[in-house]
Amino acid sequence: MTWSQDLAHKTYSIRHWADGYFEVNDAGHMVVMPLGGDGVRISLPEVVDAARAAGAKLPLLLRFPDILRHRLGKLQAAFVQAQSEWEYAGGYTAVYPIKVNQHRGVAGVLASHQGDGFGLEAGSKPELMAVLALSRQGGLIVCNGYKDREYIRLALIGRKLGLKTFIVIEKPSELRMVLEEAKTLGVLPGLGVRVRLASLGAGKWQNSGGDKAKFGLSPRQVLDVWKVLRGTEYADCLNVMHFHMGSQISNVRDIAKGMREATRYFVELSRLGAKITHVDVGGGLGIDYEGTRSRSDCSINYGLQAYASHIVQPLASACEDYDLVPPRIVTECGRAMTAHHAVLIANVTEVEAVPEGRVPGLCDDEPAVVRHMREIYGELDARPAIELFYEAQHFHAEGLAAYTLGQIDLVHRARIDDLFYAISHGVRERLSHEEKSHRPVLDELNERLVDKYFVNFSVFESIPDVWAINQIFPIVPIERLNEAPTRRGVVCDLTCDSDGTVKQYVENESLDSALPLHVLRHGEAYRIGFFLVGAYQEILGDIHNLFGDTDAVEVAVDGRGYRIAQQRCGDTTDVMLDYVGYALDEVRRVYAQRITAAGMSAAESKALSDMLEAGLTGYPYLSDVPLE
């Protein structure tokens, strides 16, 4: 099949996971469209080159703040349309939970939205302090998470300062503290209750919903809260009903089921006399990381409009059936707002090609196991390929055991490997996925016969969910996409850890154990993009092997196309050492002592001292200069 632009899109499933923000251009470059498909197209290789010319280094995180604004606009538009279709008059507010990505360049861009259609959520005291500064005057702030008196006091101060803070009661003991602190400060609190739904969305994040969820009140506890408030001056303060169905909900039916249960809570609380003005449905809106449009954990089988409709319809029907005032619908869809806006770019530093295998020449003292392997290779065109592979596996294992027992030497051990790889390649050439019986062996061979692409980044720092929960992220070369990839490879990071490897890849609307990649060219960079990393990854990233934050740039759309609006340097080695307790003055003193003790000339001592200082203050990652 002739390679083409369309085939590039299909190979990497780009059109399905990109959601209109990324595509391949005629030059074979990945391009970003921060304003959606009808807006400006920006070449990612050109952006990286411009950032490097300005001093940035790879690995490099690219942020596109215009995507944040566009995602927020699409979310709001979907609910406007759904409310119009269902004749729902309650209104809608998109709340951003800053735990998803607390960086000022993310939360601040979203918070710059003016109007009732946007709010912020905090789940800790530090997040609350940030949100109190970010929110517009009169803006909605949802205060979630476990709380002490200081947290509660700060939230109440926000209300005194003109912010619409709502303290969501997550456990019964919080209510007493809220009422006591409100009385002390002389302010009527904004209150909410988080109800714990029995409905449970399937997937990796299912524990955030359901009866066993970490947060939320049981039906009895909800009644107890209302019992305390009823008949007091605080009864009218209970305005928010909050719940959470899960995160990254893959199946739209789980959303419908959760909303049916949650709507019953709204109806019952209203019938008891609570003035619920806001129903906060929490998160759950997923991202199709896989591009499979399925119920798989890292995919979704619905679109944005379907999500909005499944949220609005049950509430619209309940309000009509029970003659209730429609509450304002609130969502906390942070993943859907932020995932697309960030792309990590990293360069391949080296490739370890899978052995092609060869047939060694005969020798007089050849062990029987080597002869058997040679015979198998000679029968590739005479016997069923699958049977030959099974026999090769048997004798390969026999050869390894013989080597371990000292029965064969290293030379013959290497010959066994050479023959096994030659047989494996020969078997794979003779199998087809069209034949159902071939698929298990073909899948095994495709997993075994892959190159290792060593990439200048850390899985644990930049895409930690790959290691932690087997999260899927689309990975695509950002250039040479007008050429057919001729190799299959796995991505390995720089860390001294076998878990620093990506094990699953998006390919042809499914998942595979390897990725189609290109052969490296001497003196030419080969750069790979890790897409949809804007939610959680920066915040969850750790410092395994002392690899810290990468360099980052913000790329903004302007009248000429784009501009690099802001550049942030990543962590340097001295910063990482200081973080784990090293006294840098002492480190430098030890270096100086050892240089003096080595008895070198003044010039050599100065040169070594300068190199040590450069290493101490340099970027922890490898040089991004192409291999010669």
Swiss-Prot record:
InterPro entries: Ala_racemase/Decarboxylase_C, Arg_decarb_HB, Arg_decarbox_C, Arg_decrbxlase, De-COase2_CS, De-COase2_N, Orn/DAP/Arg_de-COase, PLP-binding_barrel. Catalyzes the biosynthesis of agmatine from arginine. Keywords: Decarboxylase, Lyase, Magnesium, Metal-binding, Polyamine biosynthesis, Pyridoxal phosphate, Spermidine biosynthesis. One of its GO terms (molecular function) is arginine decarboxylase activity. CDD domains: PLPDE_III_ADC. GO terms for biological process: arginine catabolic process; putrescine biosynthetic process from arginine; spermidine biosynthetic process. NCBIfam families: PRK05354.1, speA. The gene is speA. Pathway: Amine and polyamine biosynthesis; agmatine biosynthesis; agmatine from L-arginine: step 1/1. Its EC number is 4.1.1.19. The modification N6-(pyridoxal phosphate)lysine is found at K99. It comes from Xylella fastidiosa (strain M12). This is Biosynthetic arginine decarboxylase. Belongs to the Orn/Lys/Arg decarboxylase class-II family. SpeA subfamily. The keyword Metal-binding applies. Its cofactor is Mg(2+); pyridoxal 5'-phosphate.
